[in-house]
Amino acid sequence: SLLTNRYEAELELLVFASWHGTEIVSIPIQVYYPPRKERISHFRPGMDFARISLLNTLLCVLAIIYGLPCRLYRKMVTFLRTAYSLLFFLFFMMVIITPLAWLYIKIGRMTEKKQVRLHELIYHAARFVMIHHGIPGTKFIRKVGGMIIKGKEPVRFDFDKPRIIICNHQSHLDLMCQLVFTPKIVFLTNQWVWNNPTYGFLIRHAEYLPVIEGLEPLMPQLRSLTDRGYSIAVYPEGTRSKDCRIGRFHQGAFYLSQELGLEILPMYLYGPGKILPKKTYHLRKGIFYIEVGNPISRKE
């Protein structure tokens, strides 16, 4: 037809995809061009110019009456999703969780039983945010032991045995994804997270440890934690990925495995880096997917 030949059909597809927020990825391919003498031209100046002019005019009109409203609607929905999630998180942390934790910590002395209950509070808070309430526009999917788990289904995996947990790092939301599995987990963080004004108080008293001057100064505390049954979670890349690709691993996690005599439990994350990419501040629609792999022994 007049508007769906060759180049025009591809252009229409790209334009409509961009209006609906579909990510367009460029994939270079090798194309064979025959020698000039062997080429056959199908160019028809009058018909081709008429078709291109008509198509561009139509697309410009549609861009104003259809494409622009679509774009504005998506921006408004993204803003509302981000604003709601941010306000919910601030209210949940600053008005409910942190005051409860502060009272619980300050009343009486800190015992091992109180420490366990503090970790259980963090665990249930993460499950409420990620599973029961959820982040608007997203789904949370877990895969454990080869089984896909959706919603509130129980996880059949032994998380009570202390291990070194490693995971790729994509977003600020990664930690929440991992916390839904067990309360017996402690994270190694950077100084910014440890001093965060929103949840820093909570993670400091939950015995999360900042890696500032290497792992050696932390070894006594890490041994104490694993002796008490806690797993140590590490992001071997050391920083969030900009494009969701897995970066080079540092040796810290493997050093801890050797020194503490623990298995390594790999977890694989996909989605947080698409929903809240590095250096962005708005939440996109998407799927949180986290998979728990098979434990890796020290020999392996």
Predicted feature locations:
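Hydrophobic/aromatic ligand-binding patch that stacks against planar heteroaromatic rings
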Residues: F16-A17, C177-Q178, L202, Y255-E259
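A cross-family acyltransferase "interaction/gating" segment
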Residues: Q30-Y32, T198-G200, D227-A233, K242-K299
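A charged, well-structured terminal subsegment
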Residues: C60-P69, L225-R228, N294-E300
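Membrane-anchoring hydrophobic helices of lipid-metabolizing enzymes
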Residues: L72-R163
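Catalytic core of membrane glycerolipid acyltransferases/transacylases, capturing the structured
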Residues: A101-F128, D158-G214
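Short acidic-hydrophobic, aromatic-tinged amphipathic segments that line or gate anion-handling sites
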Residues: G151, L209-E213, R298
